[in-house]
Amino acid sequence: MRKVILKLIRFYQKYISPLKPPTCRFEPTCSTYTYQAVERFGILKGLLLGFWRVLRCNPISKGGHDPVPTEFYLFKKSNNSLRRR
């Protein structure tokens, strides 16, 4: 099943994405990010990460470099838990 999902993403990248103007605000692109996430974490977690990434890719987002995490989590971990007062 993982191979089917990865082939669908590649199909999108090869045949559908070139028909649209580039709008992704992130590097790697959202489709590449999702592909890498599915490879790294499997179908469920990979697609969840990809879906969350697409939701974050919008006009009010700064965008920038956002690689697939090495550990699975949907929300970025904060270092504010040990704030000094």
Curated annotation (Swiss-Prot):
InterPro entries: Membr_insert_effic_factor_YidD
One Gene Ontology cellular component: plasma membrane
Keyword Membrane appears in the UniProt entry: yes
Cellular compartments annotated: Cell inner membrane
Keywords: Cell inner membrane, Cell membrane, Membrane
SMART domains attached to this UniProt entry: Haemolytic
Membrane topology: Peripheral membrane protein
Keyword Transmembrane helix: no
Summary of the function given for this chain in its UniProt record: Could be involved in insertion of integral membrane proteins into the membrane.
Protein family according to the UniProt entry: Belongs to the UPF0161 family.
Protein name: Putative membrane protein insertion efficiency factor
Taxonomic lineage of the native organism: Bacteria, Thermotogati, Thermotogota, Thermotogae, Thermotogales
